[in-house]
Amino acid sequence: MKRIYVISDATGETAERVIRAALSQFYYDEVRVVRLCQIHNENDVQQAMSVAIAEPGMIAYTLVDPSLSQKVAQLAEDHGMYAVDLLGGLIYSLSCFLGATSQAKPGLLHRIDTDYFKRMEAVNFTVTHDDGQDTQYLHKADLVLVGASRSSKTPLSMYLAHKGYKVANVPLIIGIDPPVELFQIEQEKVVGLVIDPKRLVEIRTSRLINMRQSPRGNYADYQRVEDEITSCRRLYRQHPQWMVIDMTNKSVEEAASEILRKMAVREKRITEARVKGDIS
């Protein structure tokens, strides 16, 4: 059984993924990847290398401190072990290309990796909770968007998901009660979308034409659309804790920015109230 030692100043998870991706190119199963992590000084390097030297193998390291990288390389050479710097060459090349000095902060690679997987998890959640699907899991959402059909619920949900927020959206339809779960979750999570009826008629008409369907019917009828928006506004007034966003002539990016800004203000207010002891 051959061993590959991953020496990292963070968790080593990203480096291990790189190693395993490279290993997948070989028909060789008898390899064990051993992580030696949180290496922050020469004493840590010495201890990690002692483990590797006891059962020699290949060294793969990601250390942003050049002196520690050099120490690992020297010890590996002294004991006849292969060693590869997974990060140093790239950082040096980027430094030359950008004309800038690296931050040399341990763990940034892992943080970026973690952020990526958080976004992917949010996107997956949002896709599976689009248009009123699986409402029994609304409590797991960071935000729940509600509104009439074609009020930008889905594109806004996906935009926020790519920023790492788990978003569900629920359509509001005249004559059909919203799912009971909507009123059982934390109400500050709910965002009600409104839009000018004339603008919504234009959007729905365009949608029908693109689908080669007749725009004549209730879906794009002005009175019907106006009734839908009136019904939405009535529901929002009954739930003052809900945030309300007007989507009329507003881009998805602008709406998302407004939501996140209001969320930040709300969180700050709640935090200040807790500090003062006004709420538990």
Curated annotation (Swiss-Prot):
Q: What is the reaction catalyzed?
A: N(tele)-phospho-L-histidyl/L-threonyl-[pyruvate, phosphate dikinase] + ADP = N(tele)-phospho-L-histidyl/O-phospho-L-threonyl-[pyruvate, phosphate dikinase] + AMP + H(+); N(tele)-phospho-L-histidyl/O-phospho-L-threonyl-[pyruvate, phosphate dikinase] + phosphate + H(+) = N(tele)-phospho-L-histidyl/L-threonyl-[pyruvate, phosphate dikinase] + diphosphate
Which keywords does this Swiss-Prot/TrEMBL entry list?
Kinase, Nucleotide-binding, Serine/threonine-protein kinase, Transferase
What is the top-level taxon of the source organism? Bacteria
Keyword Electron transport part of the UniProt annotation: no
- What top-level class of enzyme does the UniProt entry assign? transferase
Disulfide connectivity for this sequence is none
The UniProt annotation places ADP binding at: G147, A148, S149, R150, S151, S152, K153, T154
Q: Provide the GO MF annotations for this entry.
A: ADP binding; ATP binding; phosphotransferase activity, phosphate group as acceptor; protein serine/threonine kinase activity
Q: What is its EC number?
A: 2.7.11.32, 2.7.4.27
Q: Tell me yes or no: is Transferase among this UniProt entry's keywords.
A: yes
| Membership in a protein family | Belongs to the pyruvate, phosphate/water dikinase regulatory protein family. PDRP subfamily.
- What's this protein's function? Bifunctional serine/threonine kinase and phosphorylase involved in the regulation of the pyruvate, phosphate dikinase (PPDK) by catalyzing its phosphorylation/dephosphorylation.
Instruction: Spell out the protein name for this chain.
Output: Putative pyruvate, phosphate dikinase regulatory protein
